[in-house]
Every structure is written in C-alpha cells, then in structure tokens.
C-alpha cells in the first residue's frame, strides 16, 4: 500500500486506496470522498422484545455517525474558511516553503503551473472546505473539499507536489 504524506509536516493525507485524477497540469489531484456511517452496530439476538414487555431497546446507546471516509481515515482537521486575502497569503507562504523542499526539476514544474492552480482554487473559494493534517501544523499543506454540482459526496483537492509517496 502507498501512503501520501504532507512533504512539510509528515502527516498522512491520502493513500492509494483512494484513486486520484490529475487536474490543472498535474498540480492538483482530485479525489472522490464518500459519506459513510460509522459506529452503528445492529445486533439481532432473535428475541421478541414486544412479547417480553420490553418495547424499548435497553442495550447500549449506540449512535450512528456519518463521516467522510477520507477525513476519518486520515484524521483531517477542518479549518475555518479563508477569505481571498487569507488564501493568497497562505499560498505565498506555502509556495515558498514547498519550493525549498523540491528538487530543481519539480520546483520548475511547480512554479510554472501553480499560478493556474491557484486561480482555479480562487474561483471555487466560496465553496471550499479547508482541512489540515492531524498535527494541525501551520506550515503544512491544505486539503480542499467541495461538492460538484448535484453531488452528495465531497471531492477533495490535494497539491500533488506537496505529497511524498511512502510504501507501507
């Protein structure tokens, strides 16, 4: 299995269990998330509670919770939304920090295409949710989520150059 870690923080953000599509000249990866129900355990023991006078389930209070698979699996932490100024400030810092970690070839490719990806994200800014890795480190990359028209499950966006592939 391959795990993709944030190049700046080491947080696990994605794995090959979630297929991605490259967009914006390969700068962004688009990944489909899914809402899943977690925690509900329905055990049928074959008893008939109404015949025994117990109409209510007297077992444990087992609450079903809906979570997004990617957020839950990688313990992503949602952040407050960014306005345009905050987003541009973040991007400038992120580009500077990430560029320093890339080899010359990847650095050139990243700098050549990041402007288009930034404009793409700015165009969706009001619809984006922002997530960071489990460590919640300020200098780490962001993971973005949004809902495509008519979709009930979120789509996630990752900066491909900000991910490091690790075999598990």
Curated annotation (Swiss-Prot):
Annotated TCTP domain residues: 1-168
GO molecular function, one term: calcium ion binding
Name of the molecule in the record: Translationally-controlled tumor protein homolog
Keyword field: Calcium, Cytoplasm
Source organism, top-level taxon: Eukaryota
Gene this protein is translated from: TCTP
Family in the record: Belongs to the TCTP family.
SUPFAM superfamilies reported in the protein's UniProt record: Mss4-like
Cellular location(s): Cytoplasm
Organism the protein comes from: Oryza sativa subsp. japonica (Rice)
Gene3D superfamilies attached to this UniProt entry: Metal Binding Protein, Guanine Nucleotide Exchange Factor, Chain A
